[in-house]
Design a protein with these regions (language model features):
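A short, acidic, amphipathic alpha-helical segment used as a generic capping/interface helix at domain edges
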Residues: 120-128, 144
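Glycine-rich anion-binding loop/nest that anchors nucleotide
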Residues: 130-146, 160-165
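Active-site acidic carboxylates
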Residues: 1-102, 108-109, 127, 131, ...
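Active-site glycine-rich loop that binds ribose-phosphate moieties when present
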Residues: 111-123
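Histidine-anchored nucleotide/phosphate-binding helix
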Residues: 23-24, 144-155
């Protein structure tokens, strides 16, 4: 749903798939684990504008937290919730669902927006003795940003592949600000070409 034709299509979202596949190939060639997060909302999710009778992208509150009300998207078991068909999915070792609780949104792959519940991602990474992450995807200014900030808070070293990200950009500079926030918090930003070059 975040790609062309989807309910919450991110501008140029499809352009990230080629970058993702190149990064997957890079990881596989070095024996690095590839994982994905997946929005997995119930049809009555409280972040949906349709549940409140308002226009999509209207600001408001959900369970005491600031909330942008979104078009219905990534409804569990719908076509829109699936990973992109051109993504090299066989290489993905684990997929972590988020946004399953209808009462709170979940931008981060680690926690819901209220940090009341965590996904199994942190435990999985620690079980596999992974302490450094390479993050990319959709959308820069929401899921990528909050996943990266949470990962840094949890003590991971985080690298962000900037050309593998695209933003919603409700405000025109939201993605640029998100990259600045991630960098200021301790993430290292690379294009994929720079990453491949620096890693040898």
């Amino acid at each position: 749903d975040f790609c062309a034709g989807g309910a919450l299509a991110v501008p140029e979202g499809d352009s990230t798939v080629d970058v993702a596949n190149r990064l997957i190939d890079w990881c596989q060639s070095r024996g690095e684990a590839v994982i994905a997060s997946q929005d997995w909302h119930p049809a009555n999710h409280g972040s949906f504008a349709s549940q409140h009778g308002v226009e999509p992208y209207t600001p408001g509150q959900l369970d005491g937290l600031p909330q942008t009300f979104w078009p219905d998207h990534c409804v569990q078991n719908s076509e829109g919730a699936q990973l992109h068909p051109l993504l090299h999915q066989k290489a993905i070792a684990a997929v972590f669902h988020k946004g399953e609780n209808p009462l709170v949104d979940s931008y981060s792959a680690f926690f819901d927006n209220g940090r009341r519940q965590k996904t199994s991602l942190d435990d999985w990474l620690r079980d596999h003795e992974i302490d450094e992450l390479i993050v990319m995807g959709l959308a820069t200014d929401y899921c990528v940003k909050f996943t990266v900030l949470d990962a840094l808070q949890l003590g991971y070293k985080v690298n962000v592949i900037t050309d593998g990200c695209r933003g919603v950009n409700i405000q025109p500079q939201d993605s640029a600000h998100a990259f600045m926030e991630m960098s200021a918090a301790g993430a290292t930003l690379y294009t994929l070409a720079d990453w491949e070059e620096t890693q040898g």
